[in-house]
């Protein structure tokens, strides 16, 4: 960012006590990355690498591939119990390891390994929840916008954008109309943690565009909205389609659940019987 646009943003931030400089904005750059991926039911699922949370969805799918969801009621307590336990295991790893890889090693290969998936799947008890997992710290945000475009030549774009909280930081650069995000909330303040705040560092990021690939070609760019929910949403939609044969609309409309910080959040469409089954499992 340079010129009048950068000056407008820096002036606003400086007026609020920020130490931002024109050089900071001029040095801002995007980068090309190699997607990370796993295989689920014969399809490749591709995600953005850390600092994004896409790896969380892939860890979930690796766990669920060992459970055998296809024989379960897609709207039943057992299916959702397995999905939520896989999510809790995956988010626990996310909050311990996912960070800006340019500031330290993020063990992507280990997190996506068959060995780890086997170990995590073996921890799931079909009759009760795992007790010794960390509580998710993220608020559940609902203001993300996702879009996808495919042209006549099947070039595909999977795109997602968000200021994080509603109206981001609430700070507006008056001349340009730029509303600043508050993605710094994704950092932790624990010294020595891979995701501890530092100058020039990118925080753990929730927005994750994805693609399904078959025989080397993209067949479905996809994404969901909801902040921290997105990784669960990816795994849920893919499972709905590949385990249960739902079409895209059915997969999106199907009842959802999320292991929130205080309790399990479940969609209104989930039956009383399924809810009671989840309560019985803890």
Located regions from the model:
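Accessory "access/gating" subregions that flank catalytic or transport cores
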Residues: 1-50, 110-111, 121-139, 147-151
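Alpha-helical support elements that line or immediately flank enzyme active sites
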Residues: 2-14, 224-246
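Internal maturation/activation junctions in enzymes
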Residues: 6, 66-163, 175-176, 183
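Active-site rim segments in enzyme catalytic domains, especially the processed small/beta chain
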Residues: 19-21, 155-220, 244, 248
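Short glycine-rich loop/turn motifs
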Residues: 33-35, 57, 142-147, 156, ...
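Glycine-rich phosphate/pyrophosphate-binding beta-alpha loops
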Residues: 46-54, 144-148, 158-171, 224-230
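Extended C-terminal subregions enriched in glycine
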Residues: 153, 201, 234, 243-282
